[in-house]
């Protein structure tokens, strides 16, 4: 059945499973560098024309490492799908499909050594008849899936890093320093956590009224102010500086007014800044560099004149020194101002800015003194506040000590009152306990006295009763001496009566058991056909329910015997005669007899003579004769033993008769055991 189901299911498999396309040889990692137009793929599918090979020349580039490997592998057996250089063909549902018929076969050439180097590129053989197929593109779904997995893994790793940064300080430092946007992400999560834990704090912060700061007047620093990378302007030609034309005159005429405006503007800016921020004077004072005049070009005839110095020698401006003020802001301001002085001193027109620079120095000196005074005032006010704070602290400490002393005194009074009340309670409870113990001791003593009195009364009553009994016994012995003997006789009679009743019950059960056994025997002997005796045997088992011997005897009987019945003696004898005739026919058969042996034995059994009397030999005829004699005598046990000694076909033919005889003997033996047990019960009672 199993083979049939498997065989029937085999034709269904090709219809439900996708047809397997033949494997293809793909290019190795070195062959992938070859141009796409010259790339070729070789199929393993073999057809009737598989013996045809592509013509190759010994000097062509077809004897590369790729074709050597292909030839060596195809000469033994086609490689399986597990090979590293073999890729399964595209499924029919893929974007591009390539039929095996259009793919040229693998050239099976013997491996050639020494023709190609390991690093040389592989070029397939040129075939004029075959056109290169379009290259196969790998499935894009795997790339998208890998990219998606990469993004998911990176996102999970980034989220795990942010989460672990909130737990570990060392990892927090590493994550915020080396991971892009790590610090922003961690700070955002911490801020969200803080807002979730303290929502009211953020509301209060948002509700605060922002007071605008007084930052003073807005200071604008010109683009040309500050230090310059030029040490000095390049000198123009002397002729241009000495000649004063219309442009030069205008430039020199505007220079003093421009210098005055620049100085006044710087002074106003310094004043506004010092008034706006008294303690913070760290801003740079904008000083516009001097405008250098643009010299006009003279005519070509003046170029040949000798050069003369255009500007007198530059006098250096003294630098500002502030040694009394140690404020970093003032020192930075002085440094910036000195840098400005250095730049102006390096210029040719430094003498023009001497006046504004001097005024600026005075203003800066005044500002430094003002800052020192403000700092001193602030220190004095701070010292005053510290002294006031110390005084307030001392006062509050004294007040706190006074309160602590008052609380301590009050607590001591309360503790004393509680102690007194607790002491009174303990004394009261102890007194009550002592009184209770005394009362219990008195009660115990009184109860002991009562018990002694009761014992004495009981003892007196016992003595009185013993005296009365003695007197009564003496009187009874005199008048009622025969009453005790009569009572003893009655008790003995009752005992004998109870014993005889048990004997009667046992005898009754034994008789009932004997009757049940006789009923079973009668049923077996008087039946002409096998008759079941289940009811009779059940009655025997119920009457001897407590007897293990009877139960074992009944259990030894085969269930088929009392359910179907057993044949009688006459039936066994009649059946033996039929079995004996069949056994005589097969008495001459060997164990492995054929049809000829059966026919010969049947013929010879007709001419054999039957034995009479008590033969002593062990042949089949002698055994049958002895068995018939035992059956006529009624000795079924010996008859069964004789028939059991048969061998071969004779024993096989008498097997059923032996089984019936065994069942009959088992039933008879069980009935004999039950009858014997019943007799033993009667003997035990006697």
UniProtKB/Swiss-Prot annotation:
GO cellular component: MICOS complex
Taxonomic superkingdom: Eukaryota
Residue intervals passing through the bilayer: 147-166
Ranges per topology, Mitochondrial intermembrane: 167-686
UniProt topological domain (Mitochondrial matrix) ranges: 43-146
Sections of the chain in a coiled coil: 357-495
Membrane topology term: Single-pass membrane protein
GO terms for biological process, alphabetical: cristae formation
InterPro entries according to UniProt: MIC60
Transit peptide: 1-42
Major site of localization recorded for this protein: mitochondrion
Region (Disordered): 66-140, 287-307
One Pfam family per UniProt: Mitofilin
Localization per Swiss-Prot or TrEMBL: Mitochondrion inner membrane
Keywords: Coiled coil, Membrane, Mitochondrion, Mitochondrion inner membrane, Transit peptide, Transmembrane, Transmembrane helix
Segments of skewed composition (Polar residues): 66-77
Quaternary structure annotation from Swiss-Prot or TrEMBL: Component of the mitochondrial contact site and cristae organizing system (MICOS) complex.
Function comment: Component of the MICOS complex, a large protein complex of the mitochondrial inner membrane that plays crucial roles in the maintenance of crista junctions, inner membrane architecture, and formation of contact sites to the outer membrane. Plays a role in keeping cristae membranes connected to the inner boundary membrane. Also promotes protein import via the mitochondrial intermembrane space assembly (MIA) pathway.
Protein family according to the UniProt entry: Belongs to the MICOS complex subunit Mic60 family.
Name used for this protein in its record: MICOS complex subunit MIC60
Organism listed in the record: Ajellomyces capsulatus (strain H143) (Darling's disease fungus)
């Amino acid at each position: 059945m199993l083979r049939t189901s498997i065989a029937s299911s085999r034709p269904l498999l090709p219809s439900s499973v996708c047809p397997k396309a033949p494997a293809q040889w793909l290019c190795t990692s070195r062959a992938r560098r070859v141009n796409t137009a010259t790339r070729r793929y070789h199929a393993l599918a073999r057809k009737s024309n598989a013996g045809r090979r592509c013509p190759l020349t010994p000097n062509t580039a077809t004897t590369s490492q790729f074709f050597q490997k292909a030839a060596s592998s195809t000469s033994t057996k086609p490689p399986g799908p597990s090979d590293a250089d073999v890729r399964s063909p595209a499924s029919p549902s893929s974007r591009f499909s390539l039929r095996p018929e259009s793919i040229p076969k693998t050239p099976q050439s013997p491996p050639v050594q020494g023709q190609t180097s390991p690093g040389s590129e592989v070029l397939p053989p040129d075939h004029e008849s075959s056109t290169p197929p379009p290259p196969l593109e790998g499935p894009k779904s795997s790339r998208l899936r890998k990219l998606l997995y990469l993004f998911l893994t990176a996102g999970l790793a980034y989220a795990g890093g942010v989460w672990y940064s909130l737990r570990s300080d060392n990892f927090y430092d590493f994550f915020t320093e080396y991971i892009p946007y790590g610090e922003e992400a961690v700070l955002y999560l911490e801020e969200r956590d803080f807002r979730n834990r303290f929502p009211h704090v953020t509301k209060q912060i948002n509700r605060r009224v922002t007071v605008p700061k007084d930052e003073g007047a807005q200071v604008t620093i010109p683009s040309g102010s500050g230090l310059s990378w030029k040490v000095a302007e390049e000198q123009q030609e002397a002729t241009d500086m000495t000649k004063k034309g219309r442009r030069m005159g205008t430039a020199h005429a505007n220079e003093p007014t421009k210098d005055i405006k620049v100085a006044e503007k710087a002074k106003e800016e310094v004043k506004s800044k010092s008034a706006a921020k008294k303690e913070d004077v760290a801003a740079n004072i904008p000083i516009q560099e001097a405008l250098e005049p643009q010299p006009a070009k003279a005519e070509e005839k003046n170029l040949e004149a000798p050069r003369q110095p255009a500007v007198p020698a530059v006098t250096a401006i003294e630098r500002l020194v502030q040694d009394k003020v140690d404020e970093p802001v003032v020192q930075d301001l002085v440094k910036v101002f000195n840098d400005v002085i250095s730049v102006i001193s390096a210029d040719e027109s430094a003498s023009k800015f001497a006046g504004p620079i001097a005024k600026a120095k005075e203003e800066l000196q005044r500002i430094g003194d003002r800052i020192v005074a403000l700092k001193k005032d602030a220190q004095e006010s701070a010292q005053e506040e510290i002294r006031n704070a110390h005084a307030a602290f001392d006062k509050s400490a004294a007040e706190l000590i006074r309160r602590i002393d008052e609380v301590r005194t009050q607590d001591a009074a309360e503790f004393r009152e509680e102690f007194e009340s607790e002491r009174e309670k303990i004394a009261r409870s102890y007194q009550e306990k002592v009184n209770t113990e005394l009362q219990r001791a008195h009660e115990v003593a009184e109860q002991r006295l009562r018990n002694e009195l009761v014992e004495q009364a009981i003892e007196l009553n016992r003595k009185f009763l013993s005296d009365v009994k003695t007197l009564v016994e003496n009187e009874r012995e005199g008048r009622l001496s025969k009453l005790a003997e009569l009572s003893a006789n009655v008790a003995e009679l009752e005992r004998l009566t109870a014993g005889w009743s048990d004997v009667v019950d046992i005898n009754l059960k034994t008789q009932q058991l004997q009757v049940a056994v006789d009923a079973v025997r009668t049923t077996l002997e008087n039946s002409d056909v096998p008759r079941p005796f289940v009811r009779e045997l059940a009655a025997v088992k119920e009457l001897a329910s407590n007897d293990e011997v009877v139960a074992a005897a009944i259990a030894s009987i085969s269930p088929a015997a009392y359910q179907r019945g057993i044949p009688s003696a006459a039936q066994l004898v009649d059946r033996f005669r039929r079995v004996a005739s069949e056994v005589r026919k097969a008495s001459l058969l060997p164990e492995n007899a054929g049809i000829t042996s059966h026919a010969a034995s049947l013929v010879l059994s007709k001419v054999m003579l039957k034995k009479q009397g008590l033969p002593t030999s062990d042949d089949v005829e002698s055994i049958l004769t002895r068995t018939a004699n035992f059956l006529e005598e009624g000795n079924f046990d010996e008859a069964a033993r004789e028939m059991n000694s048969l061998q071969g076909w004779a024993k096989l033919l008498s097997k059923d008769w032996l089984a019936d005889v065994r069942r009959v003997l088992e039933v008879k033996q069980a009935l004999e055991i039950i009858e014997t047990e019943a007799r033993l019960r009667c003997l035990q009672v006697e």
